[in-house]
Regions:
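Active-site pocket-lining/capping segments in soluble small-molecule metabolic enzymes
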Residues: 19-142, 160-258, 265-805
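Short, positively charged and aromatic/hydrophobic N-terminal segments
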Residues: 2, 6-13, 18
């Protein structure tokens, strides 16, 4: 029996021209454990997203075993809630067989969709599981019409857009592509474009692309300008939390399909309260066509978790309002200020209520936080104090006068939220009962989705003059649904007079009918193992003759670096600055335009291009395309995606270890009996982060970007261990933070050639021209003469010898 979701989804009237159409709005809540699962479904979510014990981008959340996922899916479907499974990490070749077992299990156990980052996995799932929906993860970093068009052709049903995408572009994607769009509306924000961040991976061996981000963006850094500090130690990269409640009307009217709440690692109280806040706001706007007054709601959300709120890039927040540089964690709600200090007590002037068992934090150089056990107002102990009152508290630390006081936990509010989380919403059903002499009793149960369950008793009612059953008692027995997920909204009885019906028979009939209804409601898709297509995907090759030596590719950032290459026969030269590209071509006619991590445009005068986004693949008919090392190619199936789109030359991910690289190349050989032109980075500072936010402008108290300070000064971030991370920007003020150490794999180039790598890559970022020449000469001598004449200071092997990311 097929179930429609229509009745469980919020509907909005969206005007298009002179007509009006109905647009579904889905509220999608995060679930990291069973407590947050119940909090989400009991507070208005009509879809949830969860992760298993593997392949989930929140590896440190509790997550779920396979059997727990099976139970969760059944229970969610019973409550008319869809379940999307996050399979949103990059996948290594040696994990494919384990992953397939996991996906088969999820497919056969009724998961509604897979959330996927890995391009190869997207393609593989589209071919193997034709009856499941694919949602592209925000980790794929989709922010343009061209990217969305490409992914739609791959079989994608929905795209979770990059958080950097402004609402105007969101609307363009919806209108021009015709695909479901999901956006984040609340929760933590990454400072780097999702899927491009290697910072945790490189400095801490915990890859964000593998679900293990250690959040180094929440650490302190000092901004240096021309080698001198230009800031105190601050949390320069710590983003505020997204909150779009006050603009929910604009989001509804935009045509977005799904509103997503971030927070699989947050508490059940957080999940419940945030879900309820957005559910209430959406319903209110749809009913009244005006915004709900969210003042009280916003106070609750501040108390649960916030690092200060922002409207984000989605709603064009100012650059200086995107981050909080003085603290990276939960700050709560401001409740007052310290107005007097004594050896063991303080007085606080309140602007908000404060109660016993609340937790406060006093903001000073060394924050002080504690739970309130007792407090006084006007020398009397009180359980609660109110705005404008002066409250006296005992303290055991040195407190600064005039320090701001924030409440970071409200005991009473938490209790109210926990109670709301437990309030199960009952599903309305209609019962129809009939009983006639010497015939089996019949009970029919119907729900609003169209399920109709009929059960019959083995017992045949008998006539009785004294112990017959009246209709009132029958209805009372049949509607005893307290321990179920249902409530009876109507019951009809057709009962012949003076029949003897034992109560246990009525109870048995009710229990059997409810069990069958529950079973029917919990299965949405009715899939079978025969649905799974086992045909392997392949890639389209152009035969090539292998070069007797490794080819050399070099990426440079400026004309001076390019000029330094003039005396070297470099095979591929990549150049990124569009403004000076014409000049670059005059210096060296072999130069190839590199689009950069975010830009997708290719100058017409460039016959070839190094691309970083699938949105650039539309240029394949007019340009020779090369996939960059940052395209996240970590398995043979992603290789096939690029091959099938005419790209024969591709860079493999710098997150691949030596073993993973070998396994990938061997698998491509095994499946296709030949190799495309593989490129691998052996020298250069990795791009740890690429971001839209400019912390340089903010440090100088500028509201917006385009200050051009980066054009006249050299900037870097210095962390608590005194590692220096150079900074470069592009013409659109996107900021790239480079690694503090330089990758240097000169001792491995023989291995790379032996396994099938054709091109080794040198990336230059902040190097002076002389350094460029020294490094190129070093690698040229190694390739052609097997000589090694120099060492590179502050070098790193990156992940080449690290299998566990």
């Amino acid at each position: 029996m097929k179930i429609s979701f229509e009745n469980s989804t919020i509907f909005a009237k969206i005007k298009k021209g002179s007509g009006t159409s109905m647009k579904k709005i889905e509220l999608l809540a995060p679930v990291g454990d069973f407590d947050s699962f119940y909090a989400a479904i009991n507070n208005g979510a009509n879809a949830i997203y969860v992760g298993g014990k593997q392949f989930s981008a929140r590896a440190f959340a509790p997550n779920f075993t396979n059997e727990e996922l099976k139970k969760l899916i059944q229970e969610a479907h019973q409550k008319e809630v869809r379940v999307y499974i996050a399979v949103n990490t990059l996948v290594f070749e040696n994990e494919i067989s384990t992953l397939l077992e996991y996906l088969d299990f999820l497919y056969l156990n009724d998961a509604d969709a897979f959330i996927i980052q890995d391009l190869g996995l997207i393609d593989f799932v589209a071919h193997r599981y034709p009856k499941i929906k694919i949602h592209v993860s925000t980790q794929q970093n989709v922010f343009s019409v061209n990217q969305a068009l490409f992914l739609k052709k791959m079989g994608v049903h929905r795209i979770i857009l990059a958080r950097e995408t402004p609402l105007l572009v969101v609307k363009e994607i919806i209108n021009q592509v015709g695909i479901e769009v999901e956006i984040f509306v609340h929760g933590s924000l990454c400072v780097s474009y999702a899927g491009t961040c290697l910072h945790s991976s490189i400095i801490g061996k915990r890859s964000g692309n593998r679900g293990k981000c250690a959040q180094p963006c929440r650490m302190e850094y000092t901004l240096f300008e021309d080698g001198k500090p230009k800031s105190e130690k601050k949390y320069l990269l710590s983003m505020n939390d997204l909150n779009t409640l006050d603009k929910i009307n604009d989001l509804i009217e935009s045509g977005v399909t799904s509103f997503k709440i971030e927070g699989r690692m947050k508490s059940a109280q957080y999940v419940g309260a945030v879900t309820k806040a957005y559910a209430d706001s959406i319903h209110y706007y749809l009913e009244h066509k005006k915004l709900l007054d969210t003042k009280t709601i916003s106070q609750t959300l501040k108390l649960l978790f916030n690092r200060s709120f922002t409207k984000g890039y989605l709603l064009n927040e100012q650059n200086d309002k995107l981050t909080s540089t003085y603290r990276p964690n939960h700050i709560g709600q401001k409740v007052g200020k310290v107005i007097a200090t004594y050896p063991h007590k303080i007085k606080i002037q309140l602007i908000e209520p404060l109660s016993q068992k609340d937790k406060i934090v006093i903001l000073q150089k060394e924050d002080v936080s504690f739970y309130i056990s007792k407090m006084k107002v006007k020398e009397k102990y009180v359980p609660k104090a109110f705005p404008n009152e002066i409250v006296e508290l005992e303290v055991h630390s040195l407190i600064q006068n005039q320090a701001d006081v924030y409440k970071c936990l409200d005991d009473q509010k938490l209790k109210e939220i926990e109670l709301a989380n437990q309030q199960t919403k009952k599903i309305p059903i209609t019962l129809f009962f009939e009983a006639f002499l010497n015939q089996p009793m019949k009970l029919t149960i119907m729900d609003h989705l169209g399920h109709k369950i009929l059960v019959q008793s083995e017992y045949f009612p008998q006539q009785s003059q004294t112990a017959f059953m009246n209709e009132t008692i029958i209805k009372e027995q049949l509607t005893k649904l307290n321990n179920t997920d249902y409530r009876c909204q109507r019951v009809d009885c057709h009962v012949e007079k003076q029949l003897f019906i034992p109560l246990k028979e009525l109870n048995q009939l009710r229990r059997e009918a409810i069990a069958k209804l529950k079973e029917a409601r919990s299965i949405y898709h009715h899939r079978n193992i025969s649905d799974i297509l086992l045909d392997d995907t392949t890639g389209d090759f152009i035969s090539k003759k292998r070069n007797p030596f490794l080819k050399l590719a070099v990426r440079v950032k400026n004309l001076d670096q390019l000029q330094a290459l003039q005396n070297y026969p470099i095979d591929f030269i990549y150049y990124e600055d569009e403004k000076t590209f014409a000049q670059a071509q005059k210096i060296n006619s072999k130069v190839i335009y590199s689009t950069g991590r975010i830009n997708q445009k290719i100058p017409a005068q460039s016959k070839a291009a190094l691309i970083h986004q699938v949105g650039s693949i539309q240029e394949k008919d007019t340009h020779l395309l090369i996939a960059d090392i940052y395209c996240n190619i970590t398995n043979s199936y992603t290789v096939d995606v690029f091959l099938n789109n005419g790209i024969q030359h591709m860079g493999l991910s710098p997150e691949l270890s030596k073993d993973h690289l070998y396994e990938l190349v061997q698998k491509v050989k095994e499946r296709h009996h030949q190799l495309p032109c593989f490129e691998f980075l052996v020298y250069g500072r990795l791009q740890n982060m690429v971001m839209k936010h400019c912390f340089i402008a903010k440090n100088y108290q500028l509201k917006e970007k385009q200050c051009h300070l980066c054009h006249v000064h050299q900037y870097a971030l210095v962390d608590r261990k005194n590692y220096v991370f150079p900074i470069l920007t592009d013409s659109n003020c996107n900021v790239t933070i480079f690694n503090s150490k330089t990758l240097h794999l000169i001792d491995e180039i023989d291995f790379l050639y032996e396994i099938g790598i054709d091109v080794i890559r040198l990336d230059f970022s902040v190097e002076e021209p002389q350094k460029v020449q020294e490094v190129v000469q070093l690698y040229w001598d190694k390739i052609h003469h097997n000589q090694r004449n120099d060492e590179i200071p502050e070098a790193t092997y990156g992940h080449f010898y690290e299998n566990d990311l």
